[in-house]
């Protein structure tokens, strides 16, 4: 089979204005970036209030192997297949971060015959949204140090500055640094660090904002430090207007197309552990007005991205979820069944059946939200017929084989039919699991016990102290985003399959006041990844004609 980039180069793309015309987007609402990419004015959404929403399909996954289980590929394939069977569909996705593109994971534009295009542009810089977020983030950082240098009127405590610098790259050397060395002209020396842009609260805020006014308000509410009179916010250093100005184009959704010319919005990219892990609300809401079926995905597995989408994102945006698709793979179930990563390509039906427990937990969890569930078994070339049969026979929810990677929409037709049939015959009774008025501790306990299957929640002394501070400052009933490992349902990455009855430990809290949630930290969360020994970057090249190779 050809590589992803070779397949992409064979695709016959339509002019982006034709894609917009298919969606009835007026040309004066379009800002083309070349022939195949365009931004859609976010204000266009306000003109569509009278139109009914389409159906919203949330794609999530079982607890993944390090290589991932093909969530994006499945989302794209499902949307293409829905169009193929006569349903108008749009797929909405997050933008790829350059860090993973050059690191282990590679790009985030799908794969095989299920891609969004042009993949080189989407994976490398795209329309500059992530760079705009980086610049807005670092403007705030620069203004903090300028304020301190010029008298520090707010009495900012140099030991309690929460706002680091940001960069869209994996660079472990920048996690912990010392700045302002070289004399008094350079400011006050202090400890600082970098996080990857996808982990910036600016990214989370961009993905939740309704419009520029809301974006500016949210940026202003971001807590950046402790000062002599309590918490210091961005608005206290008067940086919200300039930061929002840097994002005036980034707030507009990016319209592209799939390999089969299905419309796609690729917009925003917050982490699914430290933040909510899905594309912008503006893009999803616009897609719901322009199509019959919207396919969107949430980061990592159902215990992370889907839980956050169903308990926080959908209520925040006033969204109704009509169905959940859980992406599963034979190799992931073998992994959860005890097979080592080196032996995942060998047939092992017993391990598959044992690993089905992980899938069952995620299905049970999603049904607690009142949404119907369909399982997409993402086929890989190493899967055997016996292994596939074992999953199809033993899955506790409707399970359909998905071959979009190898066959495009043709390989996802049965999945599309199953999803449509489910939506038409099993009405969704979607309701968030976590009531919005509960105190933070009760929200954490509910999520930990119902979704993570923990027996007890314990707090470190640091977490208890920070929780007290949260309550004192009015955050005691805020929505909660739990940041934990993606490699286990639990807070311990070594606990594979379906652990239960364990102690779930909250070690610290962070405030994301602009985004509108508090983050409960469970386990070590890496906000600035590092490159591996053999990064994907070593395989990426460009020739004298500008042809890029090695992207995946």
Swiss-Prot record:
Pfam families registered for this protein in UniProt: FTHFS
Catalytic activity: (6S)-5,6,7,8-tetrahydrofolate + formate + ATP = (6R)-10-formyltetrahydrofolate + ADP + phosphate
MF (Gene Ontology): ATP binding; formate-tetrahydrofolate ligase activity
Signal peptide segment: none
Protein's pathway: One-carbon metabolism; tetrahydrofolate interconversion
A GO biological-process term: tetrahydrofolate interconversion
Residues that hold ATP according to the record: 65-72
Enzyme category, top tier: ligase
Source taxon at top rank: Bacteria
Keyword Transmembrane helix: no
PROSITE patterns: FTHFS_1, FTHFS_2
Annotated InterPro entries: Formate_THF_ligase (IPR000559), Formate_THF_ligase_CS (IPR020628), P-loop_NTPase (IPR027417)
Keywords: ATP-binding, Ligase, Nucleotide-binding, One-carbon metabolism
EC number(s) stated in the UniProt entry for this protein: 6.3.4.3
Family label: Belongs to the formate--tetrahydrofolate ligase family.
Name recorded for this polypeptide: Formate--tetrahydrofolate ligase
Organism, scientific name: Fervidobacterium nodosum (strain ATCC 35602 / DSM 5306 / Rt17-B1)
């Amino acid at each position: 089979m050809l590589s992803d980039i070779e397949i992409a180069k064979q695709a016959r793309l339509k002019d982006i204005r034709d894609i917009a015309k298919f969606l009835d987007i007026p040309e004066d609402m379009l800002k083309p970036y070349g022939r195949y990419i365009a931004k859609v004015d976010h204000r266009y959404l306000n003109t569509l209030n009278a139109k009914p929403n389409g159906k919203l399909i949330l794609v999530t996954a079982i607890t993944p192997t390090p290589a991932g289980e093909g969530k994006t590929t499945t989302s794209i394939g499902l949307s293409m297949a829905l169009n193929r069977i006569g349903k108008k569909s749009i797929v909405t996705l997050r933008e790829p971060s350059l860090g993973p593109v050059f690191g282990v994971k590679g790009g985030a534009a799908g794969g095989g015959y299920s891609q969004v295009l042009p993949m080189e542009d989407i994976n490398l810089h795209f329309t500059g949204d992530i760079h705009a977020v980086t610049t807005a983030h670092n403007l705030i950082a620069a203004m903090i140090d300028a304020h301190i240098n010029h008298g520090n009127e707010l009495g900012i405590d140099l030991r309690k500055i929460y706002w680091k610098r940001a960069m869209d790259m994996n660079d472990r050397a920048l996690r912990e640094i010392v700045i302002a060395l070289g004399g008094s002209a350079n400011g006050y020396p202090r400890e600082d660090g970098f996080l990857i842009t996808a982990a910036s609260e600016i990214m989370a805020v961009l993905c939740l904002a309704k419009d520029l006014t809301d974006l500016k308000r949210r940026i202003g509410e971001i807590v950046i430090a402790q000062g002599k009179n309590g918490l210091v916010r961005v608005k206290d250093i008067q940086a919200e207007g300039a930061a929002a100005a840097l994002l005036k184009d980034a707030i507009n959704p990016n319209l592209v197309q799939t390999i089969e010319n299905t419309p796609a919005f690729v917009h925003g990219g917050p982490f699914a552990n430290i933040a909510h892990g899905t594309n912008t609300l503006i893009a999803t809401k616009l897609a719901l007005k322009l199509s019959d079926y919207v396919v969107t995905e949430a980061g990592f597995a159902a215990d992370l991205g889907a839980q956050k989408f169903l308990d926080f994102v959908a209520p925040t945006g006033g969204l109704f979820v009509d169905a959940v698709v859980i992406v599963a793979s034979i190799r992931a179930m073998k992994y959860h069944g005890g097979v080592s990563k080196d032996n995942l390509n060998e047939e092992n039906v017993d391990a598959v059946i044992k690993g089905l427990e992980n899938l069952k937990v995620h299905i049970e969890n999603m049904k607690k939200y009142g949404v119907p569930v369909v399982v997409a078994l993402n086929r890989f070339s190493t899967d055997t017929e016996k292994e596939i049969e074992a999953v199809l026979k033993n899955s506790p929810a409707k399970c359909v084989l998905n071959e979009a990677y190898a066959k495009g929409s043709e390989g996802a037709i049965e999945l599309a039919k199953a999803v449509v049939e489910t939506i038409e015959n099993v009405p969704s009774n979607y309701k968030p699991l976590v009531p919005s008025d509960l105190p933070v501790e009760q929200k954490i306990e509910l999520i930990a016990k119902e979704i993570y299957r923990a027996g007890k929640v314990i707090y470190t002394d640091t977490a208890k102290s920070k929780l007290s501070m949260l309550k004192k400052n009015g955050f005691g009933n805020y929505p909660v985003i739990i940041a934990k490992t993606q490699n286990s349902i639990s807070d311990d990455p070594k606990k594979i399959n379906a652990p239960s009855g364990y102690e779930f430990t909250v070690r610290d809290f962070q405030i994301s006041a602009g985004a509108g949630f508090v983050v409960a930290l469970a386990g070590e969360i890496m906000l600035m990844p590092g490159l591996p020994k053999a990064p994907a970057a070593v395989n990426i090249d460009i020739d004298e004609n500008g042809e890029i190779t090695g992207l995946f």
